[in-house]
């Protein structure tokens, strides 16, 4: 058991702030969608997230502790991914369709898709005229249409 006191993180600060004490908190794409629970900072400091349950934690977001004396910066963790490219846009769209149909998270960039490394996905990709390779990079998947961010549809 650690002798360090747990720090409670309660607020987002969207603007970049350079004053005060900082802790870095490196999180995977899955972990950046969870706003409550225990985490450990990069220097092993125990943190308790108690953030409003909306949106997502983005790479570079600055969070504030309940005592307003310490800042926590979110860092997107590098993950094992599959990079997918194709000769034509239509082939890449077909791959995106089939991945989405399987509820696979994808990051969409111009002429490139990224998804989490998985041998089943690699088998699927063999059925398409695409080039794919394993890479390690920060992963920023598209947010689904029905995520719980508060936005008006009008």
Curated annotation (Swiss-Prot):
GO BP, one annotated term: protein-containing complex assembly
Family: Belongs to the UreE family.
Assigned GO CC terms: cytoplasm
SUPFAM superfamilies linked: Urease metallochaperone UreE, C-terminal domain, Urease metallochaperone UreE, N-terminal domain
Principal location class: cytoplasm
Claim: Secreted is one of the keywords in the record: no
GO molecular function: nickel cation binding; unfolded protein binding
InterPro entries given in the database record: UreE, UreE_C_dom, UreE_N, UreE_N_sf
Record-given protein name: Urease accessory protein UreE
Annotated Gene3D superfamilies: Urease metallochaperone UreE, N-terminal domain, UreE, C-terminal domain
Keyword Heme: no
Localization (cell): Cytoplasm
Taxonomic path: Bacteria, Bacillati, Cyanobacteriota, Cyanophyceae, Synechococcales
Chain's role: Involved in urease metallocenter assembly. Binds nickel. Probably functions as a nickel donor during metallocenter assembly.
Keywords: Chaperone, Cytoplasm, Nickel, Nickel insertion
